[in-house]
Amino acid sequence: MTDKNPEYDFLWCPGCGDFGVRRALEFAMEELNITHERTMEENVVVAGIGCSGNTVHLLEGEQPYGFHGIHGRSLPVAMGTKMSRPDLNVVVVAGDGDFLSIGMEHIAPQAARNLNITAIIMDNGVYGLTKGQSSPTTTIETVTNSTPFGKMEVAVNPLDLYLTLGVTFIASGYSVKPRDLAKLMVRGMEHPGFSIVHVASPCTTYNDNFTQLKGSAKLGIQPTAWAIPEDHDAGSKTAARGIIDEGGVPLGVVYEDTSRPSFDAQFDAVRTKNPQKSPADLLAVFDL
């Protein structure tokens, strides 16, 4: 495919962090296409509902295949795609509301399976497409359109959740630096198992936390985004927990476990031991 849907006219708001995520995804797929000598059509982008879901329609240049599914169900769709076509690079794009609310129930099973897919989560701390309601990552006491007296629930800590559930690759990034973010996406896509790249992606309309993430010397605001030290041992769960407990938005690879086999590899081993028979082979055992 070489063309975007000509009838699709959705645009993100000016300054939306998702533009940076989209560009990073383009950089990552282009690099891996060269490295692995594959075409753009050998990539599939699966999305749920929300502003993040429109990534499948807004990518520039040569187009990967895209599946714009239903709310919270991007991981099951991605699993079906990967199991039927294990040769494809399958990428999930989802928002914090989509992935960590109705879609949260699917994270644990995928972590247990360790299927070789990559999920890119665009976290703006709010439901943007439906006009500014609180999401699972909205901080407590925050006033939104759905919490006029302040949110009463404690916010989900996504990185802590992923580590606890056993996701084998966890990275954290920031949408304002697409080139750096693309490097994390490449690492995730090359990881042999379930990988999640969680991205702070500010919503300029309903939750503009750009200044807090970046910091401002003029306003005396310390940045909440910070670079993970180069000597961080990403293979250590204890070290990963320490990074997460520091708070804020760490930038880099938080955790990677390459000791577990992927679900794909295990499934291929089973198929080798028990090869599938065609309908003709099955019918041949009967005297018809």
List each language-model region with its residue ranges.
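Glycine-rich beta-alpha junction loops
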Residues: 49-51, 124-126, 200-206, 257-260
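Active-site diphosphate/adenylate-binding microenvironment
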Residues: 2-70
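Short, surface-exposed, charged loop/turn segments at secondary-structure junctions
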Residues: 133-140, 178, 185-194, 207-222, ...
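Short catalytic-loop micro-motif centered on adjacent basic/acidic residues
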Residues: 12-14, 92-94, 169-174, 196
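Thiamine diphosphate
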Residues: 49-128
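Conserved thiamine diphosphate
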Residues: 3, 87, 135-188
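Flexible, low-complexity linker and terminal segments
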Residues: 7, 203-288
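Short coil/turn connectors at secondary-structure junctions
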Residues: 8, 39-43, 62-65, 84-90, ...
